[in-house]
Amino acid sequence: MITELHGIDIRENEPLKHYTYTKVGGPADFLAFPRNRYELSRIVAYANKENMPWLVLGNASNLIVRDGGIRGFVIMFDKLNAVHLNGYTLEAEAGANLIETTKIAKFHSLTGFEFACGIPGSIGGAVFMNAGAYGGEISHIFLSAKVLTSSGEIKTISARDMAFGYRHSAIQETGDIVISAKFALKPGNYDTISQEMNRLNHLRQLKQPLEFPSCGSVFKRPPGHFAGQLIMEANLKGHRIGGVEVSEKHAGFMINVADGTAKDYEDLIAYVIETVENHSGVRLEPEVRIIGENL
């Protein structure tokens, strides 16, 4: 118990595999669940004062946490999940579930968020990664975000300053943490929006191994190619290291089929990169983030 942070939900030596989509990850020294910006500021101020590292884990969907875990504070925004509408502008806190947020937009007959209807993760992580699918991405509807800087200051960042690119945003370099974000939507027809979301979710269910733990799409799309196609052509579908294998359903995914570890994921990623490069001459670049310490 840290007496200076009394009243905040903080768990010591907490295994992170219970919170990640991959079902891997060692312990966090301290795992914190702030309920509001005040509690978040208290955690960051304490960590900075004590020279303790801290990071925000988000919804841990496109992420691998190593088996040795993470030192210092890991902050999760599960309780910072409010969503508000002001006309055609939707504002969501960083911990809001991305899929549920698209359903709120649909309920109010607002169009623009359909592309994200099946993307797992949080609003904060989606902004960080400029998440996208089926021709849409966060940058297409993003207005601004409130962020927390490493020094504990809260500031607003515009779409221009975010410098979005393919699975990229400026905050990947600055280390700023999204607290909330605003999105510009447009009035639409409820039935049309609903039909499009159903169509995209059907495609996702057909093509992706949603029945297994995974980190989502492992590799960025190489120019002029598709990562899954290159992996398939290198005869890597079903290739397994430890408890993790390249999905038979979609070669761009790696799934945890038998109590796999983060090391299994990393070893399989490295093997796929090397094998694909030897086969096609194309070097794949991981989209998934890998953080933490090895055992």
From Swiss-Prot:
GO terms for biological process: cell division; cell wall organization; peptidoglycan biosynthetic process; regulation of cell shape. This is UDP-N-acetylenolpyruvoylglucosamine reductase. Pfam families: FAD_binding_4 (PF01565), MurB_C (PF02873). Residues 23-188 form the FAD-binding PCMH-type domain. It is found in: Cytoplasm. It comes from Streptococcus pyogenes serotype M49 (strain NZ131). The active site is at R167, S217, E287. Its main location: cytoplasm. Disulfide bonds: none annotated.
